């Protein structure tokens, strides 16, 4: 029996990066997946992984679309057991140069989008007897970095805070909530394969002296959504090659 046999996951941002890697890992472990993305690339994920995956176009900042996403998962699979709020954007600019529009955009996707996925994820999971919510934060939500990403960091810190609140509020109702905090992971958003060579200062900031791979984050996500992780909730878990340890 595979670790996630019979489980259904809703994964946002599933057209690329860590979310696509999670989709692969979950299907490998026996889960079915609703793969959501705004880009259209969720169709590629579904084509790659076959009938276990249903694609869904979704802007996570639009509440009606998030509600429709969960409705589609229930229509397709009959239940939801795990929600992975991965979709996000990056932004880099010195704090004094960030425009109000840039601030709003980052907060809209990286904080509001995760809030909506958590809110409607909780409501959906309650109707299915409970489950797991994994919210993507960042090591930037824990510590400041050498890069000018203050607004991004603020949004990711917010994700940590309300993920903890969700864990406390809904723990007795069968819902676990966990914040995953990737460090320098070589995805398209961070520059893709070879990004470690272009940003050596980030690599040197880790204990392992290398960048991480999306699959390494996906392995953690798969475990956390399994029954083996049943006593883990309210946790903030860095996947960063020891980056936060070097900054402690």
Identify the role of each PLM range.
Residues 4-34:
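Canonical Rossmann dinucleotide-binding motif of NAD(H)/NADP(H)-dependent dehydrogenases/reductases
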Residues 94-95, 102-107, 202:
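Substrate-binding pocket helix/loop in short-chain dehydrogenase/reductase
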Residues 118, 155, 163:
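Active-site helix of classical SDR
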Residues 123, 168-169, 230:
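Alpha-helical segment proximal to the catalytic Tyr-Lys
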Residues 138:
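Residue(s) in the substrate-gating loop at a strand-loop-helix junction
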Residues 143, 222, 233-248:
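Short C-terminal tail/terminal secondary-structure segment
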Residues 171, 176, 232-234:
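Short, small/polar-rich loop/turn modules that mediate ligand/substrate recognition or access, typified
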